[in-house]
């Protein structure tokens, strides 16, 4: 009888845990793929991550970002140092680790080619930060993300198929890069 009582107690406890898990899952807002809430990355930028050719420079950096799906924003911070030339611009691109993808959003530019309100890139060493919203997403349309399509950009960010890239006068295609997948 005592054994049967313990079995019933364990069964009730397991049932309560399952019920609470189901309730918590139902309470969190989710999109069609089942995502909801926040997603964060923290990456080290290096010239070795550049594509199609890895580079060997002293340039380095850090990129941190948090996607808040409830507010439709990505807050970010980019630090860079020891670049081999003057920084010209920095972006988030849409592409795999060994792919050169199109620009999704500007982080900064000194080339005057960013959307209105894009901050200028200070000389290295520097740390800049900002918030990306739908109005900051510029594409890439050729890869299926239209300008202003924050939900598609957010899906790519969550899936780890975006990367941060810092471009310099010495390396216009990019000097340091990090895949945003951790």
Write out the residue ranges for each language-model feature.
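Metal-centered catalytic cores of metalloenzymes
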Residues: 2-9, 17-90, 94-182
């Amino acid at each position: 009888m005592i054994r049967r009582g313990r079995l019933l107690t364990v069964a009730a406890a397991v049932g309560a845990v399952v019920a609470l898990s189901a309730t918590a899952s139902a309470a969190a807002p989710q999109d069609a793929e089942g995502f909801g809430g926040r997603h964060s990355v923290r990456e080290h930028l290096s010239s070795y991550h550049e594509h199609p050719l890895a580079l060997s420079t002293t340039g380095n950096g850090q990129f941190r970002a948090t996607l808040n799906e409830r507010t439709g924003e990505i807050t970010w911070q980019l630090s860079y140092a020891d670049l081999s030339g003057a920084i010209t611009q920095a972006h988030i691109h849409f592409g795999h680790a060994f792919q050169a993808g199109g620009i999704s959003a500007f982080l900064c530019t000194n080339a005057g080619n960013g959307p209105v309100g894009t901050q200028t890139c200070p000389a290295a060493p520097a740390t800049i930060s900002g918030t990306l919203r739908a109005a900051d997403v510029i594409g890439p349309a050729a890869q299926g993300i239209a300008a202003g399509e924050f939900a598609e950009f957010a899906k790519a960010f969550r899936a780890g198929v975006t990367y941060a890239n810092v471009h310099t006068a010495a390396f216009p295609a990019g000097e340091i890069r990090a895949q945003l997948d951790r």
